[in-house]
């Protein structure tokens, strides 16, 4: 059975309904109106170069009856070349592209034909579609001075109300404008098999990153936007995070490929921050930092706005070579609730699930309702990491308050980890440990369930630190480590190649082992 995830005026993203992780069980061919248009083996696939407001009949030998869909209608479609864009990779096309965006009528499409469009940051508006066709590249300018600085906070000159415009790692601070930027906009689609290239190596954005005067630009930044869809494109080489929706609602990323060199700093693929309803489906990532990092700000933003990252779905994604496949935090002071990760493959990431929090994130820093199921991990150093002692950011990261193993008072600075379920998973060639879950003595992790999981260890495993905290020793082929957990349920879990005890526990309120 096939389900439509997203249909624009010229593209469609569809998903096979099964319980397999990322890949289907066999190759398949897709026909549109009787003509072969796609072949592949992934659970999610896309069709492009469709006509607006047109009915299509999709057929495949693996479905019993044809699937019929209609593309959306649109008011008009305009080429950026009509506004003077050259697309030779040398000419600065910023003015031409921005003018085209400004002039585009509502419910219309701006088309980028094959070519390389060198540009400074672009500002989008509501009710438009950008189509970046195969062979088209939006290339960020290598001139840093072309990226305007956006203030972190502005105040209404009449009411004094605070408005956040710029943000960096969970704080409202001045930042360079993203290459593709939208503010308080709605109903925006970016589709196509083209590329958006941040051009960070040429601009020198990855050099001396700790001493930049302003937050480095994202590839795409959506601030307080609604109904945003990004479908099909290849995003690469951003100066920092690649896709960053901030305080936005109903955001979806479908069938993207996002890449950056393994050693590139802060090049997370998708980092939704304090967003409500986010879908990340059918995407492939290979980056220098976390593949997906779900955030909700540091304590100032979390305490003031109390806006959790809520109702996020991650499904049928392939994540490679990141620090964490799916990371929560460390900027999560507003909380993370109702997260489902399903049918994904994690390959050679440092960690599978990676929770990063610490004392000081605040009482609103609640992570709860997290489910991982039907996951396959290959060569992941530590598949499950829940760390309430994270020490790799903030000026006080090395303070005794952060690292002390003493039971401190629960106060307005204390985070909370609630219920977590991991089931139907295969984790092959682990190295450091199967699990490393370490709660606070004053605020243990509420409940962890691990069921129907196979962990195997690489015979060539190298010692590694499973989590980033003060005084963290290296592990190698360790089993499941749990400390400070109120209720732990272990059901039908198999470990192969572990050195020592399979289950290492301390300060567990209730242990249920089946």
Language model segments and positions:
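Extracellular/periplasmic carbohydrate-active domains that bind, remodel
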Residues: 1-514
């Amino acid at each position: 059975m096939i389900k439509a995830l997203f249909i624009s005026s010229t593209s469609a993203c569809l998903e096979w309904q099964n319980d397999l992780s990322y890949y289907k069980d066999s190759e398949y061919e897709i026909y549109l109106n009787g003509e072969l248009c796609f072949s592949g083996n992934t659970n999610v696939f896309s069709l492009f170069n469709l006509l607006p407001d047109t009915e299509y009949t999709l057929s495949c030998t693996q479905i019993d009856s044809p699937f019929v869909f209609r593309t959306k209608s649109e008011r008009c479609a305009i080429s950026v070349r009509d506004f003077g864009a050259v697309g030779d990779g040398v000419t600065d096309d910023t003015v031409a592209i921005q003018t085209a965006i400004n002039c585009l009528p509502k419910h219309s499409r701006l088309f980028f034909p094959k070519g390389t469009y060198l540009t400074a940051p672009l500002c989008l508006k509501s009710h438009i579609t950008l189509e970046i066709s195969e062979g088209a590249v939006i290339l960020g300018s290598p001139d840093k001075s072309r990226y305007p600085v956006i203030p972190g906070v502005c105040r209404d000159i009449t009411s004094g109300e605070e408005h956040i415009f710029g943000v960096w790692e969970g704080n409202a601070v001045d930042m360079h404008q993203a290459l593709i930027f939208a503010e308080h906009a709605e109903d925006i689609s970016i589709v196509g098999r083209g590329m958006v290239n941040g051009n960070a190596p040429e601009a020198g954005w990855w050099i001396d990153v700790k001493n930049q005067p302003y937050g480095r630009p994202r590839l795409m930044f959506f601030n307080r936007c609604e109904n945003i869809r990004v479908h099909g494109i290849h995003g690469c080489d951003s100066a920092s995070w690649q896709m960053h929706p901030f305080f936005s609602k109903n955001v979806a990323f479908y069938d993207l490929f996002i890449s950056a060199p393994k050693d590139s700093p802060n090049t997370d693929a998708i980092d939704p921050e304090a967003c409500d309803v986010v879908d990340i489906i059918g995407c492939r990532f290979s980056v220098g930092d976390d593949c997906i990092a779900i955030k909700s700000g540091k304590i100032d933003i979390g305490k003031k706005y109390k806006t959790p990252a809520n109702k996020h779905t991650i499904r049928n994604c392939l994540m490679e070579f990141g620090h964490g496949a799916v990371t929560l935090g460390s900027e999560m002071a507003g909380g993370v609730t109702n997260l489902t990760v399903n049918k994904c493959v994690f390959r050679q990431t440092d960690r599978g699930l990676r929770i990063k929090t610490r004392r000081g994130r605040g009482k609103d820093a609640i992570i709860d309702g997290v489910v991982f199921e039907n996951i396959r991990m290959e060569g992941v150093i530590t598949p499950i990491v829940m760390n309430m002692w994270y020490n790799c950011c903030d000026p006080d990261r090395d303070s005794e308050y952060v690292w002390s193993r003493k039971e401190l008072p629960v106060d307005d600075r204390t985070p909370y980890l609630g219920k977590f379920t991991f089931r139907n998973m295969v984790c092959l060639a682990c190295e450091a440990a199967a699990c490393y879950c370490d709660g606070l003595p004053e605020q243990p992790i509420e409940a962890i369930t691990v069921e129907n999981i196979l962990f195997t260890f690489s015979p060539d495993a190298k010692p590694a630190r499973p989590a980033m905290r003060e005084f963290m020793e290296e592990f190698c082929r360790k089993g499941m480590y749990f400390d400070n957990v109120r209720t732990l349920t272990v059901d039908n879990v198999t470990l192969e190649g572990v050195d020592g005890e399979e289950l290492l526990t301390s300060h567990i309120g209730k242990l249920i082992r089946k």
